[in-house]
Amino acid sequence: MKALIVDDEPLARNELQYLLNLNDAIDEIEEAENIEETLEKLLYNTFDLIFLDINLMDESGIDLAQKINKMKRSPHIIFATAHEKFAVKAFELNATDYILKPFEKERINQAVNKVDMAKDKPKNKDKTITPKYIDYSDDERAQTHVLPIEVDERIHILNFTDIIALSVNNGITTIDTTKQSYETTETLNHYEKKLPSSLFIKIHRATIVNKEHIQTIEHWFNYTYQLTLTHEFKYQVSRSYMKTFKQQLGLQ
């Protein structure tokens, strides 16, 4: 495969080129340090993948990615950056992967392998469509429909609809989804600010649940409820959150 590295820092380009040269799937590597040089190379060459930094001197890598996506045969875009805050936007642009600096050989190989497996398949440039049964209209935080979380220096993009519950214990926040569970040291409050209140309910100072995943509600001790969610996850509604919980589910 033919790769293009776009970064305005020579050391970053050299490091990435060194790691790519160790990968047998990469046959040829070219470099560019700015937008103009990148577009010129894309005009006269065909690349399978492009490693793209976000903070370029003359323009944002996000803006460049938008231009690349309009090309008839656009390369797979792998954002390679020191900043995690653009992860959601990157995946909205249908990026194949998002890698954080400093680079690691294993992580680079994972990204290359993704492209190698997908390069013969047509790229879907349509954005993810949110199921119609969820009404996000009153909550601006739901406009992205996804929650980025960082686990072991890797960012995972979780669809709101896949998240079953979030809970914290001994400083570790566990995010249970329909596919797997994730553990992170980020606070529950951090995630609460990013979740739409139209979909997620706080039932305890240490627990937030997705109301679309509530299967049954049982009366529990001290006039509280016990919830059974998707995959048989069970959580208790704290007495101090009972009133709000009933209101949000229309139980009053």
Swiss-Prot record:
Its main location: cytoplasm. Residues 147-251 form the HTH LytTR-type domain. The modification 4-aspartylphosphate is found at residue 53. Keywords: Cytoplasm, DNA-binding, Phosphoprotein, Transcription, Transcription regulation, Two-component regulatory system. GO terms for molecular function: DNA binding; phosphorelay response regulator activity. Residues 2-116 form the Response regulatory domain. It comes from the Bacteria. One of its GO terms (cellular component) is cytoplasm. Member of the two-component regulatory system LytR/LytS that probably regulates genes involved in cell wall metabolism. This is Sensory transduction protein LytR. It comes from Staphylococcus epidermidis (strain ATCC 35984 / DSM 28319 / BCRC 17069 / CCUG 31568 / BM 3577 / RP62A).
